[in-house]
């Protein structure tokens, strides 16, 4: 997957190690307070996957303080699951009761406050409630994605049969299956969400802790995009960093750090 963001991170690291030779991006803490404070303010200009105004609004509502919540936001911020964002935020902050489809599913859904977010959770629900094997659970996930009625009817019968063996009433099992099916239509693969969330967190960490280096690298990869340059210039000024105009006698071909509080 070719992403400009990966090149920005790489160039940012090259700038950082000029002063901090021991810096390793893979060793940064995933519980950095400055990073979460920045995200909770919706300060996401230049941050991978989190830069839109809509995402900034979600982060201000959520006030994330752990990496798992960044993964969930990446998965939820899409048509369909987006409807669950208000409940996700409210449940985190105790403004809404956390409810589970069944008490047996607390371990499966606790991380996401009782809301089905990932395809993997659909598979785990089938395993816990209806004794599906991992292979069977994957077939269920695929069937729910395809919405082929014949397959769905077979899966529903299998799901209810397994649930009854775990002392769950047929009517309740049928209701749970229908609810899971509804969510499964837009469930996101957690491993994909985690990969994107990690890049998002890394860019947020770099901006929070090494703003000069990060913004310099970001500017240089936006050099042919006037609107992006203007946005980044506004962000730099908001952070009280000076932004010098080009000088034919002194400027480099690309943006660079002049001093600790000045770009050129």
Model-derived segments and their meaning:
Residues 1-264:
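Noncatalytic, beta-rich nucleic-acid-contacting surfaces in large DNA/RNA-processing enzymes
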């Amino acid at each position: 997957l070719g992403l400009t963001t990966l090149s920005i991170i790489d160039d940012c690291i090259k700038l950082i190690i000029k002063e901090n030779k021991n810096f390793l991006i893979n060793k940064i803490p995933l519980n950095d307070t400055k990073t979460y404070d920045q995200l909770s303010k919706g300060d996401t200009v230049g941050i991978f996957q989190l830069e839109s105004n809509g995402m900034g609004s979600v982060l201000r509502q959520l006030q994330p303080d752990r990496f798992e919540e960044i993964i969930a936001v990446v998965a939820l911020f899409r048509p369909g699951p987006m409807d669950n964002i208000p409940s996700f935020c409210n449940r985190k902050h105790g403004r809404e009761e956390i409810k589970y489809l069944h008490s047996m599913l607390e371990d499966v859904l606790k991380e996401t406050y009782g809301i089905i977010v990932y395809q993997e959770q659909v598979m785990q629900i089938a395993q816990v409630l209806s004794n599906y094997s991992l292979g069977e659970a994957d077939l269920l996930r695929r069937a729910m994605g395809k919405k082929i009625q014949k397959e769905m009817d077979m899966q529903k019968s299998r799901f209810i049969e397994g649930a009854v063996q775990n002392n769950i009433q047929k009517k309740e099992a049928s209701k749970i299956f229908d609810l899971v099916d509804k969510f499964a239509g837009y469930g996101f693969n957690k491993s994909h969400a985690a990969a994107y969330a990690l890049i998002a967190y890394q860019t947020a960490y770099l901006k929070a802790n090494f703003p000069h280096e990060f913004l310099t690298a970001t500017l240089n990869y936006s050099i042919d995009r006037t609107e992006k340059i203007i946005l980044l210039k506004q962000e730099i000024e908001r952070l009280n960093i000076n932004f010098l105009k080009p000088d034919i006698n002194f400027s480099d071909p690309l943006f660079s750090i002049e001093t600790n509080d000045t770009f050129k």
